């Protein structure tokens, strides 16, 4: 058995089974290597989307840096075998400056870079992240950091935007109207998880506070908003407000829809509310879709 010098890292590696590199015969420089994905011939079909998923990368949402989860894609002509996927990351790095600003204009610029670098007609991106914002307790006005989940979706073909979407998921309180109606006192309440997917005007810029407008529609129509910090006067207000505004899941999504339909920069929306029922072992949910 071969003895290795265990006082060195290389010796320890070989002691645990590492071997020397094989002296091969294939090229070792980029210019000499075969570039298979750049092969051009008839590959039968065009591909609408090909790219990468689950790329974690820093993003800026308003004043906070957070982690974004990206999916990038481009189209692929039928006479090309594949795309050069490393160019996707190169395009992302080109737009990096302490995080990619999560706004539609920034994502549009990123897609144009990707489109040109990949030499393809179409490109798309979906990116999810945690949106942090200031939230004040309702009576004592104590500031703390609240959060919601956001997902941006954008796609372009040539110079035209073909998809422009924003999804927000936030948690609220819902108090059961039936429980309030039949009980001598009190009513059961629970945490509701509300998801709004808004299909935005593809031909115009969004208004400055578009996220806040959608979030307000989701939260203000619930029995109560969730707060990071509540003192006793705040808790009293929250409890009483919930009792004054009972909501079924059906009620909540209809009220949210009534607000969203008034926004001329929204072309349509999908809404879902799922209640984690406090008196059942199952959840309750409601869902609706609307297109103008």
From Swiss-Prot:
E.C. designation(s): 3.5.4.16
Top EC group: hydrolase
Gene Ontology biological process: tetrahydrofolate biosynthetic process
Keywords: Hydrolase
Catalytic activity: GTP + H2O = 7,8-dihydroneopterin 3'-triphosphate + formate + H(+)
Function: Converts GTP to 7,8-dihydroneopterin triphosphate.
Family matches, as HAMAP family: GTP_cyclohydrol_B (MF_01527_B)
Protein name: GTP cyclohydrolase FolE2
Intrachain S-S bonds: none
Organism: Staphylococcus epidermidis (strain ATCC 12228 / FDA PCI 1200)
Cited InterPro entries: GTP_cyclohydrolase_FolE2, GTP_cyclohydrolase_FolE2/MptA
Keyword Hydrolase: yes
Thylakoid keyword on record: no
GO MF entries: GTP cyclohydrolase I activity
Site residues by UniProt (May be catalytically important): 176
Pfam families associated with the record: GCHY-1
Superkingdom of the source species: Bacteria
Family membership noted in the UniProt record: Belongs to the GTP cyclohydrolase IV family.
Pathway(s) this gene product operates in, as recorded in its UniProt entry: Cofactor biosynthesis; 7,8-dihydroneopterin triphosphate biosynthesis; 7,8-dihydroneopterin triphosphate from GTP: step 1/1
């Amino acid at each position: 058995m071969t003895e290795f010098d265990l006082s060195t890292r290389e010796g320890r590696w070989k002691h645990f089974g590492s071997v020397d590199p094989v002296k091969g015969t294939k090229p070792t420089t980029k210019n000499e290597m075969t570039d298979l994905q750049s092969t051009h011939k008839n590959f039968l079909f065009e591909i609408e989307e090909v790219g990468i998923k689950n790329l974690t990368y820093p993003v800026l949402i308003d004043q906070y840096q957070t982690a974004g989860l990206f999916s990038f894609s481009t189209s692929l002509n039928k006479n090309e075998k594949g795309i050069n996927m490393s160019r996707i990351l190169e395009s992302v790095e080109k737009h990096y400056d302490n995080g990619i600003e999560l706004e539609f204009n920034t994502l549009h610029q990123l897609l144009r870079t990707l489109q040109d670098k990949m030499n393809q007609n179409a490109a798309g991106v979906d990116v999810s992240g945690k949106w942090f914002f200031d939230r004040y307790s309702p009576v004592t006005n104590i500031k703390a950091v609240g959060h919601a989940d956001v997902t941006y979706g954008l796609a372009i073909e040539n110079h035209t935007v073909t998809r422009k979407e924003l999804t927000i998921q936030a948690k609220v309180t819902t108090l059961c109207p039936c429980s309030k109606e039949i009980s001598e006192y009190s009513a059961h309440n629970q945490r509701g998880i509300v998801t709004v997917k808004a299909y935005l005007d593809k031909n115009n810029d969004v208004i400055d506070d578009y996220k806040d407008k959608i979030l307000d529609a989701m939260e203000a129509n619930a029995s109560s908003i969730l707060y990071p910090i509540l003192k006793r006067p705040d808790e009293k207000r929250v409890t009483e407000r919930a009792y004054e505004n009972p909501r079924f899941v059906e009620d909540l999504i209809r009220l949210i829809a009534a607000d969203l339909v008034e926004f001329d920069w929204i072309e349509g929306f999908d809404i879902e509310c799922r209640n984690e029922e406090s008196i059942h072992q199952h959840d309750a949910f409601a869902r609706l879709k609307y297109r103008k």
